[in-house]
Amino acid sequence: YDHLQGIPFFGPGYVPMNKIVFHGCHEELPDALHKQMQPPYFPVTFDEMKAEISFEIHKPGDMVEVAGYKVLTVEQDHPGLSYGYRFERDGKSIVYSTDAEHRAHHHRKEYPFLDFIRDADLLIFDAPYSFNEAGGAKEDWGHSSNITGVDFASRAQVKHITIFHHDPAGSDKNLSRFLRETRNFLHRRKNTNLPVKNAEPGEGPFGLDERFPEEISLSYDGLIIEV
């Protein structure tokens, strides 16, 4: 329910003459939206939204054209499944990857998710946990770590990674420290000179490219990033 609770308050859905298309990969998406908007959960039913609403359900790996953007989809590891989206237009690309758990054995060069995010200008990455938390007490919770995000961004040559889906219990002070530790990890790794066999120029240990990511940021309400 926490994934959908903003929909009943989506103002454009109540405006007559608006046309709204919900895109997703969950086959049960229409049923889920209807069920959450009924008493006793919510006083207004989904059918009372005045806009003209339709659904388009896609399969993982599909590529569709939406509002001038090429949109690609990928299935992700999360309880109940989740899906990541890659948006491409005018030579720029943004990947939105929420509610995804990338495990320790995924830190290998042939991991398919790396191809999905490769060369992205911006990767919006779900990472509420430290590396130790993600592989320990919070394993199987469906989320990833800051270190994993930086590792993937480096190996896939992503220019900018912004971390989001913060721990609800985290304070502003904790989040600032989390960002600082993430940037420190990148700085230390870039300044660690380790011999690498058969490495291409700019490529570090285990497929890491020391040139990427160029920037790390932390998401917040109202954040605007130009790509």
How would you name each of these model-derived features?
Residues Y1-V95, R103, L114-D115, K173-V227:
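Binuclear metal-dependent hydrolase catalytic cores
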Residues D99:
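Conserved acidic
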Residues A104-L208, F212-E214:
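Cap/insert and terminal regions of metallo-dependent hydrolase folds
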